[in-house]
Structure formats: structure tokens, C-alpha cells
Amino acid sequence: MMHTRKLAVAGGFEFTPDIHSDHRGLFVSPLQDEAFVAAVGHRFPVAQTNHSRSARGVLRGLHFTATPPGQAKYVYCARGRALDAVVDIRVGSPTFGQWDLVQMDAESFRAVYIPDGLAHAFLALEDDTVMSYLVSSAYRAELEHAIDPLDPAIGLPWPQEVEFRLSARDTIAPRLAEAEAKGMLPQYADCLPAAAPPAHPDRPTVR
């Protein structure tokens, strides 16, 4: 069983799986194909899996991939705790500039689907926080970009009691308005999934 919530960002979803526990431990399925297709409308095309481990206070993001080709992500916390952020940076999107936050931990195994063109970040709230990613395309450095995760115009409410640790790249990343002015941001139309062909293109579809 999977519980689904639409994010405040168009096209994004939160998935919370049922957990099966007994005296041995637990078993959980963070990605379930049937539930994913029912929510999103297509299967998740896994091309690569990624794994990160972070100390408390590590803030990774806001990251996005040039679109096209884009990169969709399915992210969950396998160990520790994290605050996950998704920001709509698609120019022309009905939810441009909006964001949503998801509390992630290794107790709920809550996951987030991040479609092409959205920016993603997370803040590790415990040492040895492990995040697992399924992504729709292989990593290509020349396509990867970042936006300042502390941009006041976006206004992500990161907890202030945590001392942030950012990479050199994320520290100097442009703010959203600067990235838009430079033409760095994806266009909403380029991020929409292509329409699926009919099952029998040689004859009309019967409804």
C-alpha cells in the first residue's frame, strides 16, 4: 500500500509506503510501480541509482539538470533524517517560484518524485544521513546547474538552529532571478512529458 500526496509544485508527488515490521526488523518498498503510474501517469525510467551520505548540517542543492534532456528523480532517506525541498524553476509553469518541503527519515521512508525541470535540495538533520536517488538519466557534469538554496526570494524555511555546510559550487550559485536573467532556467513546455501514442494508431480509439 502506498499513500500519495500532490506537492504544491505542479507534477511533483510525495509517496509514503506502508512498513512491515516484526521482531526481525522491517521491510519496505519505497518505490511501487503501480502506485507511481496511478499518480504520475507513466513508469519511472530508472537509468542510474545514486547514494549520498551527509553529516548534520550538510545542505545539498538547489540542483537541476538542463532541459532538454532533463533528469527526473525519485528520492528517499535510507538512514537518518533530512528536510527535502522541491522548487519550481520552470519558466512559464503555473507554479513557478513555488516550493514544497518533505520531512524524510528512515522510519517513514517517505519519498519524493521530482520531474524534469524542478530544482531539488535537502538538508541533513542528523550525522550519517543517507539519501538514495533513482534518476532517469546518467550524470553529465556539463548539464548540471545550481541555484542558491538560501535565496530570500525563494524563501525556503530551513531550520536556523542548524549550521549549514555547503559545497563550493552551491555557495556561489546564482539566485533564482539571476539564473533566469542569464537564461539558465528550463522552459515549462520543454519539461512536459510527450503524449503517449494510441495503442493502435491505424484505427480510432474506442472509449
Segments the model singles out, each with a brief description of its role:
Residues 109, 116-135:
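Ligand-binding loop in jelly-roll beta-barrel domains
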Residues 1-107, 126-128, 138-207:
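Non-catalytic, conserved peripheral segments adjacent to functional cores
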